[in-house]
């Protein structure tokens, strides 16, 4: 961990892996020497984890559930990586994690709104903060942390830009709540990506800090052009914030945030998630997590843009185009129904409307062949028919 993890992992991945080591690996395998660890040991370990109580990160809602198969798979990935490193360092000759049998895991498909459901959500939303967040997610394919970390100095919504269709946002940072110990460890290694640490407004001590930090990957730093509706909503919010600043004067805590409380303090992901739950409860729309709006946005852009994957990838900030097609090309039943109708009209009905040459029966075929091979007989038959007429 000290040699590899702190030199390669970001704060979130580091925190999650430290949590898995502390609560899932050390209690059950901590007394086993690496050289003595076998594939059978790991098989038994993963099987037993299914009956162990899950341990949630600090600040997360407690649960009575047992360790999920998703967590087991991630724990295995961590162990496999660590044991690969042990092979490289020549502590062991082979990696015992390579041939383990994991409990079967079927990833749960995330619910994603259709275009009509997303439009209904926007039309029904009366909370200005949630509506602005939804517009940025659907219009710009932004992650929730990128939306909450967006600052006005990265927004171009001048009248000229809106008229010319060049209004845009520059995504250069994200807002995130991180474990203090992970942040401190990365800081000591000179790998901190924190740009700003927000004050702690709660009096009680916390193990986490709310920060503005650089995005997770280089490709996440990007420029996204704004649909006019989104640009106008941002302009309206900027005017509203200016009025509040003048009203509160020194009482406004100005962090230059686009999405902010009435006194300037930042919103957090859990607060936006709560607002979204209230909206789905009130409207009867399918309950979704906020990140699924980004899925919805990417799918809409793929459809509207005729499958222009590179353009969509530029908006989503994914490092690889495969991630856009694999994760975000969400196809719903209505689209599949329309596709079936199009196959019917463009293929089967056209085939039915095309005149088909009827096959000849055996007697007719023999007569036809006889006339072709004996043109004199054919002329005689024609002359006879003409006389009868």
Language model region names:
Residues 1-43, 237, 241-254, 333, ...:
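N-terminal DNA-binding module of tyrosine recombinases/phage integrases
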Residues 2-89, 107, 265-271, 286-292, ...:
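N-terminal core-binding DNA-recognition domain of tyrosine site-specific recombinases/integrases
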Residues 55-58, 63-69, 73-75, 88, ...:
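Basic, Lys/Arg- and aromatic-enriched nucleic-acid-binding interface segment
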Residues 68, 195-211, 215-285:
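Active-site/catalytic core of tyrosine-dependent DNA strand-transfer enzymes
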Residues 70, 88, 135, 139, ...:
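C-terminal catalytic core of tyrosine-transesterase DNA break-rejoin enzymes
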Residues 87-96, 156-163, 177-183, 234-249:
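Proline-centered turn/helix-capping motifs that create local helix->coil transitions or kinks
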Residues 104, 112, 163, 173-177, ...:
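Catalytic-site neighborhood detector that most strongly recognizes the C-terminal catalytic loop/helix
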Residues 157-168, 173-221, 230, 263, ...:
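C-terminal secondary-structure termini that scaffold catalytic or DNA-interacting sites
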């Amino acid at each position: 961990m000290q040699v590899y993890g702190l030199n390669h992992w970001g704060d979130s991945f580091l925190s999650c892996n430290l949590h898995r080591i502390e609560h899932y690996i050390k209690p059950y395998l901590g007394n086993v020497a690496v050289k003595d660890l076998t594939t059978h040991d790991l098989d038994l370990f993963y099987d037993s984890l299914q009956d162990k109580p899950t341990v949630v990160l600090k600040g997360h809602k407690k649960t009575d559930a047992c360790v999920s198969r998703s967590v087991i798979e991630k724990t295995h990935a961590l162990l496999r990586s660590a044991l690969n490193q042990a092979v490289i360092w020549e502590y062991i000759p082979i990696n015992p994690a390579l041939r383990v049998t994991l409990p079967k895991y079927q990833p749960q498909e995330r619910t994603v709104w259709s275009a009509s459901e997303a439009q209904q959500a926007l039309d029904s939303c009366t909370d200005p903060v949630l509506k602005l967040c939804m517009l940025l997610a659907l219009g710009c394919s932004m992650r929730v942390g990128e939306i909450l970390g967006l600052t006005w100095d990265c927004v171009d919504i001048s009248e000229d830009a809106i008229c010319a269709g060049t209004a845009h946002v520059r995504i250069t940072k994200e807002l995130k709540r991180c474990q203090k110990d992970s942040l401190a460890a990365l800081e000591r290694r000179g790998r901190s990506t924190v740009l700003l640490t927000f004050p702690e407004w709660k009096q009680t001590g916390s193990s986490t800090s709310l920060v503005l930090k650089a995005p997770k990957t280089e490709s996440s730093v990007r420029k996204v052009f704004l649909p006019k509706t989104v640009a106008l909503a941002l302009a309206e919010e900027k005017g509203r914030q200016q009025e509040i600043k003048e009203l509160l004067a020194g009482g406004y805590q100005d962090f230059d945030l686009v999405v902010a409380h009435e006194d300037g303090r930042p919103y957090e992901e859990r607060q936006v998630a709560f607002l979204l739950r209230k909206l789905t409860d009130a409207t009867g729309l399918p309950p979704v997590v906020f990140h699924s709006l980004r899925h919805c946005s990417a799918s809409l852009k793929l459809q509207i843009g005729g499958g222009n994957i590179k353009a969509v990838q530029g908006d989503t900030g994914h490092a690889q185009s495969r991630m856009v097609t694999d994760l975000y090309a969400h196809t719903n039943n209505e689209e599949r129904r329309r596709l079936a109708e199009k196959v019917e009209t463009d293929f089967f009905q056209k085939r039915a409307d095309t005149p088909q040459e009827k096959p000849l029966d055996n007697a007719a075929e023999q007569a036809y062949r006889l006339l072709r091979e004996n043109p004199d007989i054919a002329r005689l038959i024609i002359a006879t028919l003409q006389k009868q007429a």
